[in-house]
């Protein structure tokens, strides 16, 4: 299900003294089945943008097309409920939205709200709990007895139980330790590959953006500043830093090595493994002479 933004503008508190423009002139497409990252400094428009993906917000101007659904200024999409089933959104700290007596009831809430029978919803809950790497015996427990990481996975299972075609992730690893962050990101990537889900990730973690995303959209002051592959986007390191966007640690180390040893590493290195390989290649080609001078 392809998603397209066409000249999208959004203003909060439109036509009031408190009006504030959050998005303008946003033209971007998310072809079906891809993995995308949206990055940018705080306040750049990332969260406002993704709230247009399932009709939580409506453009002030322009059009958002999500498959066969069109959302535009002044026109209400009649099938928002169906759209929200197709586009699952995992907001920051989704575990705060858990409320039922048991894990099973919490996961079943979405499917039953969309008209699925109780028996079918329970089957979806069993499948979803396994998709997020938890044991089915947790279904009978209260979600509030679980660890923070388990609660987050339960909340994500509730989104997956509705079988979305698009999974939107707004800082999904916020507050987790490094091990938990890595496990969750690997889980999302596995779902993307095995289920063919379109994934749209909003993140401040540049390592995650570089590692997982096929395309990266850089937002700045409410519009698209840069778009391309990780290699293309992070080749504009100086420009990104000027607008407050962090760089992957491998690029920071690359700069430090170049400055320290007076060598040039031409390739954009997006992982420490890439950086190690490129440093070895440069030294083999004679870069070590620069190091010793």
From Swiss-Prot:
GO molecular function, one term: ATPase-coupled transmembrane transporter activity
Gene it is expressed from: ecfA2
Job of this protein: ATP-binding (A) component of a common energy-coupling factor (ECF) ABC-transporter complex. Unlike classic ABC transporters this ECF transporter provides the energy necessary to transport a number of different substrates.
PANTHER family assigned: ENERGY-COUPLING FACTOR TRANSPORTER ATP-BINDING PROTEIN ECFA2, HEAVY METAL TRANSPORTER
Record text on subunit structure and interactions: Forms a stable energy-coupling factor (ECF) transporter complex composed of 2 membrane-embedded substrate-binding proteins (S component), 2 ATP-binding proteins (A component) and 2 transmembrane proteins (T component).
Pfam families: ABC_tran
SUPFAM superfamilies: P-loop containing nucleoside triphosphate hydrolases
Gene Ontology terms: cellular component: ATP-binding cassette (ABC) transporter complex
Organism per entry: Bacillus cereus (strain ZK / E33L)
Family stated for the protein in its record: Belongs to the ABC transporter superfamily. Energy-coupling factor EcfA family.
Disulfide bonds listed in the record: none
Enzyme Commission code(s) on record: 7.-.-.-
Top-level lineage group: Bacteria
InterPro entries xrefs: AAA+_ATPase, ABC_transporter-like_ATP-bd, ABC_transporter-like_CS, ABC_transpr_CbiO/EcfA_su, ECF_ABC_transporter_ATP-bd, EcfA2, P-loop_NTPase
Domain ABC transporter: 3-246
Record localization: Cell membrane
Matches recorded under CDD domains: ABC_cobalt_CbiO_domain1 (cd03225)
Record membrane topology: Peripheral membrane protein
Binding-site positions, ATP: 40-47
Keywords: ATP-binding, Cell membrane, Membrane, Nucleotide-binding, Translocase, Transport
Name this protein carries in UniProt: Energy-coupling factor transporter ATP-binding protein EcfA2
